[in-house]
């Protein structure tokens, strides 16, 4: 069973600092969670995730792990923690977003989500019940309820229909979760996902419905269906609608977000947990996030820059390698370039939430955030 305690609140915003306790260790919030979709954070050794990046919790994805390596392998391995040799907390998404974004053929009904594999075209179905069973076999500490990720530009009628489907699935998912047990000797908790697209009344209805199902097995609440095509200001507006309605004694997780500025703005609105592929995916393409802004390491301006990769960075790679050297590696399409950039970006994202936490505790988060955000968005 997970437990969340809030240790500090910002007096000028909804930001808060907390501790999320799981059987695989504590997570200090606000936190960023590196995405390890198929049991691996792309381009990073676990050694570096632990000692350099200082990741406290990572993600896995049910859709990908269900398809490959498959549930038989994961069960024989004793779950994902043992399979990938990671003894800190893991969170798994239900796979709903991946069905929405990857599956070439999909059909959503009250029964569940029928889809074809993007790997070999084979046919599958996720129901709320078998999705619980699948995530029990994977064995993450925190599991997400099955939902439909509604497109950001959906009209009200579609969004309302989508929410009704998600609510029906949530009722069955929560009931089956409560009737089943973890498989590997440690506890698991589940987060309902609050949907509703960009419509405040739908978000409010989603929270009201989810809270009717609240009990000790609901370790927190996720806010989904944002950063999927809607304007950024709409995302912030939906957080302002949703977060105040959620329990104060449970963590809030904003799924799939986002840029460093998005994360700080999310913290200011009461979010505790974040994940995003941006630091890894953009890093592989030469984009580095820093306190001074965003660097494109493919740009010729770095050709003769022999200064450290990031003088303000805390990662090993930041002081060990020069900008000129990493620029060369990207131009030469060396695999190592992507590894260095990924390590830097993930370390920066973890630094970002760590420093944000320090300012929440110190009581000056909002002025600090307001001063930092414009710099984070600059192009260097």
Task: Identify the role of each PLM range.
Residues 123, 127, 158, 165, ...:
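Catalytic cores of large soluble enzymes that bind and process phosphate-bearing ligands
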Residues 152-156, 160, 220-227, 335-338:
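Glycine- and acidic
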Residues 1-183, 300-303:
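Non-catalytic, usually N-terminal nucleic-acid engagement modules in DNA/RNA processing proteins
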Residues 139, 170, 174-177, 181, ...:
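Structural signal for hydrophobic packing residues in well-ordered secondary-structure cores
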Residues 164, 176, 180, 185-309:
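Glycine-rich phosphate/ribose-binding loops and adjacent secondary-structure elements
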Residues 1-22, 27-34, 42-43, 147-153, ...:
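C-terminal extensions of enzymes
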Residues 130, 134, 161, 165-172, ...:
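A non-catalytic, amphipathic alpha-helix used as a structural packing/dimerization or gating element
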Residues 25, 58, 93, 135, ...:
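Conserved, mostly hydrophobic/aromatic
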């Amino acid at each position: 069973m997970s437990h969340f305690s809030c240790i500090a609140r910002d007096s000028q915003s909804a930001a808060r600092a907390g501790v999320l306790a799981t059987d695989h260790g504590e997570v200090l919030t606000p936190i960023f969670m590196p995405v390890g979709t198929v049991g691996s954070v792309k381009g990073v050794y676990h050694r570096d995730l632990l000692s350099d990046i200082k990741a406290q919790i990572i993600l896995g994805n049910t859709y990908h792990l269900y398809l490959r390596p498959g549930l038989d392998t994961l069960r024989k391995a004793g779950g994902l923690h043992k399979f990938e040799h990671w003894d800190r907390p893991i969170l798994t998404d239900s796979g709903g977003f991946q069905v929405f974004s990857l599956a070439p053929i999909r059909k959503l009904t009250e029964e569940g989500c029928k889809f074809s594999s993007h790997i070999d075209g084979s046919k599958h179905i996720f129901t709320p019940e078998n999705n619980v069973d699948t995530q029990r076999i994977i064995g993450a500490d925190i599991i997400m309820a099955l939902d439909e990720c509604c497109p950001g530009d959906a009209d009200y009628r579609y969004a309302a229909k989508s929410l009704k489907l998600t609510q029906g699935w949530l009722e069955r998912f929560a009931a089956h979760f409560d009737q089943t047990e973890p498989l590997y000797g440690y506890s698991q908790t589940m987060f309902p996902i609050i949907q509703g697209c960009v419509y405040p009344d739908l978000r409010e209805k989603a929270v009201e419905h989810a809270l009717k199902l609240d009990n000790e097995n609901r370790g927190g609440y996720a806010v989904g269906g944002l950063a999927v095509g809607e304007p950024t200001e709409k995302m912030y507006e939906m957080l302002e609608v949703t977060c105040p309605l959620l329990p104060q004694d449970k963590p809030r997780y904003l799924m799939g977000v986002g840029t460093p500025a998005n994360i700080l703005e999310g913290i200011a609105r009461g979010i505790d947990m974040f994940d995003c592929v941006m630091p890894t995916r953009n890093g592989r393409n030469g984009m580095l996030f820093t306190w001074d802004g965003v660097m494109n390491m493919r740009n010729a301006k770095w050709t003769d820059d022999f200064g450290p990769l990031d003088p303000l960075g805390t990662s090993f790679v930041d002081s060990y390698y020069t900008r000129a050297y990493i620029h060369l590696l990207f131009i030469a399409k060396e695999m190592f370039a992507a590894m260095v950039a990924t390590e830097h970006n993930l370390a920066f994202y973890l630094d970002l939430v760590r420093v944000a936490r320090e300012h929440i505790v110190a009581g000056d988060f909002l002025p600090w955030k307001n001063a930092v955000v414009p710099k984070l968005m600059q192009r260097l």
